[in-house]
Amino acid sequence: MTQVCFVGDPEINLRYELLSRETARDALQTYDLGTPFHNSIGVETVSLGAAVALTNDLNWYIVRFVADVLVYDPSVSESEWLSRDLATAIRDDDVAHEESGRFLKIYGLEGDHGGTGGDGGSSPEADREIASEGEEVEESPITTGPSGGSEEGSAIDSGPRIGAEEPPRLVEPMYVTRTGPTVPEYDLRDVENTLVVRVTEDEFGA
């Protein structure tokens, strides 16, 4: 299974913005929604191609409400995430799996107590309430993504929990180049943990 995580802009409530809009809600309704990080929505899809297709279907909303899109595919790396652009390049065979790990963006994780996320206390009932109360807005037409879903016990929804605490917050990314087998140390601030995201060369140089 391939995981996709949409991280919201700091000034908005991402779950509300997406679930209060009919087209985005329809695109996400076949998935079990998790909250692996603060102000994020995480889903599991059947493949890397399905994950990229979902991000394309939600592009109108990504541009307006999302600060970052992260993709996790264990066939590429069991410990590192991919940027949306790199996931697309790998799907299109423009970048080989084994050549994808040179350019990195490392996030600090604040409030992480040993896991990489949890569900943040959300529930299907709360999501339905958001959907019913949300004001429908006029939006550009997009198609819904492929059918997907999470098996019971999936990593993104029933992995390490934070209990009553907030999911960890992604902070202050640091861009580094990997020149050996280890990842350079994150040194922008003191954090409990880090999240490594592989990016494209163009993203690294931007």
Regions found by a protein language model. Name each.
Residues P36-V76:
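Short, well-structured hydrophobic secondary-structure segments
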Residues M1-L28, H38:
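Short, extreme N-terminal segment that most often corresponds to the first beta-strand
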Residues L54, L82-D85, T116-D119:
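Short, conserved acidic/polar surface loops in the N-terminal third of protein domains
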Residues S100-A206:
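Acidic, proline/glycine-rich low-complexity IDRs
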Residues D32:
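A glycine-rich, hydrophobic loop/mini-helix early in the fold
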